[in-house]
From Swiss-Prot:
Region ranges (Disordered): 15-50, 99-262
InterPro entries for this protein: HAX-1
Annotated segments matching region Required for ITGB6 binding: 269-278
UniProt protein name: HCLS1-associated protein X-1
Membrane topology: Peripheral membrane protein
Involved in ATP2A2 binding: region residues: 202-244
Annotated Acidic residues bias: 30-43
A Gene Ontology molecular function term of the record: signaling adaptor activity
Main localisation: mitochondrion
Region (Required for localization in mitochondria): 2-43
Chain residue ranges for the region called Mediates interaction with UCP3: 209-278
Region annotation (Involved in HCLS1 binding) ranges: 113-278
């Protein structure tokens, strides 16, 4: 079976009148097809008059032409006329071959919905983010939303108490202010109360720095300075004095007699005994 037979069977066209493949040419021909072609040429199964259509020559196997109505027609005996006719009908219904009768117009300023338009002097923050998830009504064009939609004035259910983690509220209690999802005016609150109530207390680390300095004076007195600085910046200095130790412990050399310092005293010690003995 040739590729052309598969293509024709896929689209449901009738079977061929010969074993020759005029559409794909020699791509699917083999030796058996060549022998069949020679036999058919001898028997004259393909008449010369079958090719003469719309001025086509007998040697031509495939062709197409354009009709005045704008359609395209294939010439040949393989059922392409029905295929092209079906495609023309499909695209004509879809409007793919026809241009729009009028050009598209750009929307003008009058196409805007007057209900969504902001009031004069009203900011986008006040209209969109003032009460995002609360049950309080919004204000559009000076009219409350509850007046326009009475059924929307129902209070919103408290989904926080029914959530999957509502049992953890006892462990980590949540204040009512944290549950309220509203866009608060922080500028006026800061100007009135300051940043203290708004900022959450942060945990602080405590540390202490201790420095000790000892000074030994010439008389042997030891002076000790103990300075303690805590995390708050407070400084406390304590000074202690320690008296000198015993002279026998502090001075390793024994005291010398004052007589040894005088040379006459030394001579008196050495020669005095000799003269006194005489």
């Amino acid at each position: 079976m040739s590729v052309f037979d598969l293509f024709r069977g896929f689209f449901g066209f009738p079977g061929p009148r010969s074993h020759r493949d005029p559409f794909f040419g020699g791509m699917t021909r083999d030796d058996d097809d060549d022998e069949d072609d020679e036999e058919e040429e001898d028997s004259g199964a393909w008449g010369r008059e079958s090719y003469a259509f719309d001025g086509f020559h007998p040697t031509e196997e495939f062709g197409f032409s354009f009709s005045p109505r704008g359609g395209m027609r294939f010439h040949g005996n393989f059922g392409f006329d029905d295929l092209v006719r079906d495609f023309n009908s499909i695209f004509s219904e879809m409007g793919a071959w026809t241009l729009p009768s009028h050009s598209p117009e750009l929307p003008g300023p009058e196409s805007e919905t007057p209900g969504v338009r902001l009031r004069e002097g009203q900011t986008l923050r006040d209209s969109m983010l003032k009460y995002p998830d609360s049950h309080q009504p919004r204000i559009f064009e000076g009219v409350l939303e509850s007046h326009a939609k009475p059924e929307s004035s129902k209070p919103a259910p408290d989904w926080g108490s029914q959530g999957p983690f509502h049992r953890l509220d006892d462990t980590w209690p949540v204040s009512p202010h944290s549950r309220a999802r509203e866009d608060k005016d922080l500028d006026s609150q800061v100007s009135q109360e300051g940043l203290g109530p708004l900022l959450q207390p942060q945990p602080k680390s405590y540390f202490k720095s201790i420095s000790v300095t000892k000074i030994t004076k010439p008389d042997g007195t030891v002076e000790e300075h103990r300075t303690v600085v805590d995390s708050e910046g407070r400084r406390e200095t304590t000074v202690t004095h320690q008296e000198a130790h015993d002279s026998s412990r502090s001075d390793p050399d024994p005291p010398r007699s004052s007589a040894l310092d005088d040379p006459f005293s030394i001579l008196d010690l050495l020669l005095g005994r000799w003269f006194r003995s005489r």
